[in-house]
Structures are given as C-alpha cells and as structure tokens.
C-alpha cells in the first residue's frame, strides 16, 4: 500500500514538474509567488461567474479589514505586471491554490480545492486580436502534448492527443448542434476532433443564452472578431476516454480593455464594480493590455495519468459516498 501511494505521488510530481518546465520555456514566462488572500473592497478578487461566495477570513492584527481566500489570480496578475513594469511579450506564472466552497457539484472533475498554473502576459503592440489568442492557445497546447509524450516515455501510457488543436466559435457550435445543451455540444465537437479551443464564452448566443457564465471584468467576451462572431476568450477542451466526455483543461483569454470593461459591466448590471480601486486603475490606463488564464493542475495530471477521479491526484474533501466509490482517493 505504501509503495503504491509513493508511486502515485511520484507520477503526480513528474507531470506537474514537467509541465511547469515546458510552460515557462515555451510561453516565455517567469514563475512568481502569489497570494492566497485578497482584501475585500479593492476589486482584486475573481468573481468567476458571479454566484460563488468566497471563504471570508479575519486577521487578528488587521482588525479594520476583511480578507477572502482567492478564487483565482486573474486580476492580481494584471496588477502585478503593471506594478513591476513588465514589458510587451513578458509574463508570469503562479502556482495558484484556491478554495471554491460553492462548487455546485463535487464529482469526478470538480473539487472544492483548486490548483492552477495561473499565467498572464503583456500583449505585444498591435496584437490584441483573435490571431494572437490562437497563437497563444497553440503554444499552450504544444506544452500539453510535450508533457503527454514525456509521460508516455516514462510510464508507458499511450499518447492520444492530436497534433493540432481545432478552433471553433460558440456561435458556430450552437448553429451546428441547435438541439443540444452547451455541455452536449462540447461533447459532440470534442469527440470528433480530440482537442478543441472553444472561442467566445460569456456573451449571449443566437439562441438567447450564453454558452457559459463569465465575470464581466477579466476576459473580453464581447469584442467582435470575424464573421460576426464575438469574444476573445475560450476554453481548451480534450476528449477524455476514461470519462467518455469532453474535459476542460484551461480557461483563458485576452483581458478587457477600458471599452470592453464598461460594455460588459453594463450588460451584466455590475457597474458598481467600477468604483473599486482595481477597476479605476484599468479605466485610468494604468494597466497593460494582457492575455492570461488558468490551467488546471489536478485536471492535467488526472487526464495525462488516465485517472477516473480528480481525488486520485489531489487531497481534498469529499462526501463519504465518493470515498466509498473510488479505491484510490487521496
């Protein structure tokens, strides 16, 4: 039992370390330290889809402030790039750990505990566009494939990912599968191509509903791109044979500029956020134009090691029935 546990931990570490090294080299970012707490009221917390309640923390020696465990570091990263004067094409990555206790489903792929490679880069001049988004997606996908090949060589786990990732807009997807739910559309298209980047998540589609929810103040999901499509963000999805479904590895995008921020908070009714320090800084031109995202660490390990449950590669909390159903939950 001990030997099996140690081997399991060695596999997890190998995937994480290998991916980290490739990501830093290929994406050209530096690894930095990030926070676990965010001060309430500065606007730095990631509100995700807008419905999740963060974990509140009171610090004894700072009685006049309340803090929250971060959901992600989407806004902190952009603030940090500005604070330390990162130049165009430069960026950072954080080994981010977070808690999302309002996760509405604790299942094979969702956990209260979130670990990500949280990265952000300053966009080169003239490249705040769909082409640069796709170029960055292809770089990250290359890192995923290189890591998969390293796992194959070390553990004899057959590589399954296609050489290229396929791009498709959410508007195209709803037109192609009008009678399916968003999740069913993801399953259908990802099963065909093996690896897909789904572009434009957050805005209302022709069927009157968004593909999925996104906060209005980090990704740009409203800017028109091509053929009347909208959105400069998206998800990297791969086909997971163990689960028989599409499997999200990363959510990422070009971040809002001043106009996209104002447009999106008006659409979602979140204009009050513009009073926060972070949002004021953006509107006053103090932040660089950036692209960024989060790549799920446990999800990546789960996929590349062909595990059935995310609890096999991370230590979290689970209902007893989950522990009873899977032998290798950590």
From Swiss-Prot:
Pfam families: AsnA
Keyword Mitochondrion: no
Biological process per Gene Ontology, one example term: L-asparagine biosynthetic process
EC number(s) recorded for this UniProt protein: 6.3.1.1
Organism per entry: Streptococcus pyogenes serotype M2 (strain MGAS10270)
Superkingdom of this protein's organism: Bacteria
Gene Ontology CC terms, in alphabetical order: cytosol
Pathway: Amino-acid biosynthesis; L-asparagine biosynthesis; L-asparagine from L-aspartate (ammonia route): step 1/1
GO MF annotations, alphabetized: aspartate-ammonia ligase activity; ATP binding; catalytic activity, acting on a protein; transferase activity
Disulfide bond annotation, renumbered to this chain: none
Enzyme class: ligase
Record protein name field: Aspartate--ammonia ligase
Cellular compartments annotated: Cytoplasm
């Amino acid at each position: 039992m001990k030997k099996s546990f140690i081997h399991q931990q060695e596999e997890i570490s190998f995937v994480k370390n290998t991916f980290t090294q490739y990501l830093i080299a290929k994406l050209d970012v530096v690894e930095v330290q990030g926070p676990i707490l965010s001060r309430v009221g500065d606007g730095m917390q990631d509100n995700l889809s807008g419905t999740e309640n963060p974990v509140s923390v009171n610090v004894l020696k700072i009685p006049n402030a309340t803090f929250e465990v971060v959901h992600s570091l989407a806004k902190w990263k952009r603030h940090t790039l500005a604070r330390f004067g990162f130049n165009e094409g430069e960026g950072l990555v954080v080994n981010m750990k977070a808690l999302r206790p309002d996760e509405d489903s604790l299942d094979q792929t969702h956990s209260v505990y979130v670990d990500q490679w949280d990265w952000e880069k300053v966009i080169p001049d003239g490249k705040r566009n769909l082409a640069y988004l796709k170029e960055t997606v292809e770089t990250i996908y290359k890192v995923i494939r290189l890591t998969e090949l390293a796992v194959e060589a070390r553990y004899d786990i057959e590589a399954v990912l296609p050489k290229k990732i396929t791009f498709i807009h959410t508007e195209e997807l709803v037109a192609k599968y009008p009678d399916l739910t968003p999740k069913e559309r993801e399953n259908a298209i990802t099963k065909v191509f093996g690896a897909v980047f789904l572009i434009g998540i957050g805005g209302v589609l022709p069927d009157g509903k968004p593909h999925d929810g996104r906060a209005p103040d980090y990704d740009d999901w409203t800017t028109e791109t091509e053929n009347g499509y909208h959105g400069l963000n998206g998800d990297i999805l791969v086909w997971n044979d163990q689960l028989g479904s599409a499997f999200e590895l990363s959510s990422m995008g070009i971040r809002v500029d001043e106009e996209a921020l104002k447009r999106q908070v008006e659409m979602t009714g979140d204009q009050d956020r513009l009073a926060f320090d972070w949002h004021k800084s953006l509107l006053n031109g103090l932040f660089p134009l950036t692209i960024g995202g989060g790549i799920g660490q446990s999800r990546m390990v789960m996929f590349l090691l062909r595990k059935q449950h995310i609890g096999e590669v991370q230590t979290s909390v689970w209902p007893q029935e989950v522990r009873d159903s899977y032998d290798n939950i950590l």
